[in-house]
Structures are given as C-alpha cells and as structure tokens.
C-alpha cells in the first residue's frame, strides 16, 4: 500500500472513535475547588512561553498529518487557526515530503498561513536510525526549511511500527542519531511518543539531548488500534494490534514519571479531551499541553475555531476555580489522586 493511501487512512481512522483506546487517567486527578479564589475571572492571563517563544496559551495543536491533498487542506486550516489564536503547531511526519517532493506543499501551507507562531517539524525515529549522518543532516535541514520550524520533534513510535503492515521497527542507534539531529537543526529538539507514553527510565536517557519531552501517553488516539483497523487482509497484524492496543503508560502517569527525573520542558499529550484535562496536566507538572484528535475531528466538521476557543475557556475556568492567575501556578494547586494513579506512583516510586 502506498504511503499516501496510508496517510489518508490515518486521517479518517484517527478522527473516529475506533482509534480511541484506554484512559489517560486524568479522571484520577481532582483539583481542589477554591470557593474563595480572591481573583476576578478577568485577572487570568494564559500567556506563557513555548521553549522561549511567547505564546498566548499553554496549549498547542498536536502532530497530525501531511502528504496528501486532504492533509494539505487540513494543515492549512490548522495553521490559520494557530496563527489566529497565537498557539504553537506541530506538523505530521514529514518523511513523505522528503521522499516525494511533489507533496511538500502540504506542509509548506503551514508557514504560509502561520508565519509568526512557533512551528514544529516532525521526523520519525525508525527512519532516522537507517540514515547516514549526511542523509540525516539533509533531512533535518529540509524539514526545518519546509515549515520555517522553530523546533524539531522526533517521534518514537515503536509500538506502531511493529504492528504496521509496512512498519520499520528499527530503533538501534536512535539516541546517537538524536544528537546529530540536534546539532543539525540548531534549534530546540523535542522527543515525543505517539500514544504509548515515556517512562522515567527513557526520560533519564533523553535528558542529555532533548530540550523538551512530549510524553504522548496512552488514553487517546492509538496508532496500534489504527494499524489493526487498516490491516483488513493481514490477519497477523490484526491479531497483534488487538493484543497490544492497550499497551503503554497513561498520560497522567507518564507526566509524573518524566517529571521525576527530567528538568527540561515537559509537554503533555495523549487523551487530553478538554481544557480541564489540560489544566490537570499542568497541575501534574507539565509546562504545556497539546491536542490532536479533537482538533482533527473539529476541522473535518468545520468547527475548529469553536473547539480551540472552548478548550482555552475551559483552562481559564479551571484556573479561576482553583484561584490562580497564571498557567505555571497550577502546579501549586492542591489535588487528590484516585486509586489507580496513586497505585501507579507508589509502585514506581514516583511522586507527583
């Protein structure tokens, strides 16, 4: 199956409920209500920084797509909204545009429609692992130029690759390749998961190279489930995808794991379905959060701006009801954890 067909499959499946698996455990994070907040709602200021760049909210558009005509239209709409709201935006994996230059435009529309916001390039770890240093540097330079990227993300998607019919489960030497990416990019490096989470052991290894870790935890879009749904004629892929679709670290737990060993910038993603979930992620210690599936679905339904406005409003309400004026103050809000998250933290020897 061609990579362009695969990209469109991912769009339709990711926007459907079939791709949504497990729980991110945000329902296990209760922010204590402040009946006497001693602030006005108008006092709340969501502005913050994203790896040093000023942005209007601690919220961004997560990695989604690129490489097909449909993907290009989606990216253009996402970019326009990101520019309007002053929030960062990831693009989807740029590999397709690096091997098929005729589809570069599906990514270039992002810099054309969002000239001033931080844009994040996106490359896959298994592909980088197979490139020579010269080829890798060339890919990084092209990916950055394609969208005028402020930062570069490398996604870790071992679970997806090992169940994907066309997968490339090649991860030997990735850590060394990340160092090359950082040197070649000359800008912040984000290392991210795509729905299975990052443990404290992996975060400790990434500390030497990553300027930011995006936890990409379990509880939202599952690329394992997506690949299983795509594998209509491949019984083995369907079988193993069904077996492993709940594999991973829930996002709330992953934030805590990463924060316990990593002092860099932490981005929460995976199963964040509202501004309240985003506020919970910030309370756990994340500096920023992103959403993908709800925004993809909203784009396809013609209500993207309404969805972004709702998320931003929900974050502000959560801040008002906990009595904080700035996003970073959410980390000081008293909270109670449910039994599943508490048990995870205890067994892993992690506090949050």
Swiss-Prot record:
Its main location: cytoplasm. Substrate binds at residues 6-7, 93-95, 160. This is Isopentenyl-diphosphate delta-isomerase. Belongs to the IPP isomerase type 2 family. It is found in: Cytoplasm. One of its GO terms (biological process) is isoprenoid biosynthetic process. Its EC number is 5.3.3.2. GO terms for cellular component: cytoplasm. The keyword Cell membrane does not apply. PANTHER family: ISOPENTENYL-DIPHOSPHATE DELTA-ISOMERASE (PTHR43665:SF1). Its cofactor is FMN; NADPH; Mg(2+). Mg(2+) binds at residue 161. InterPro entries: Aldolase_TIM, FMN-dep_DH, IPdP_isomerase. Involved in the biosynthesis of isoprenoids. Catalyzes the 1,3-allylic rearrangement of the homoallylic substrate isopentenyl (IPP) to its allylic isomer, dimethylallyl diphosphate (DMAPP). The gene is fni. FMN binds at residues 63-65, 93, 122, 192, 221, 271-273, 292-293. GO terms for molecular function: FMN binding; isopentenyl-diphosphate delta-isomerase activity; magnesium ion binding; NADPH binding; oxidoreductase activity. Keywords: Cytoplasm, Flavoprotein, FMN, Isomerase, Isoprene biosynthesis, Magnesium, Metal-binding, NADP.
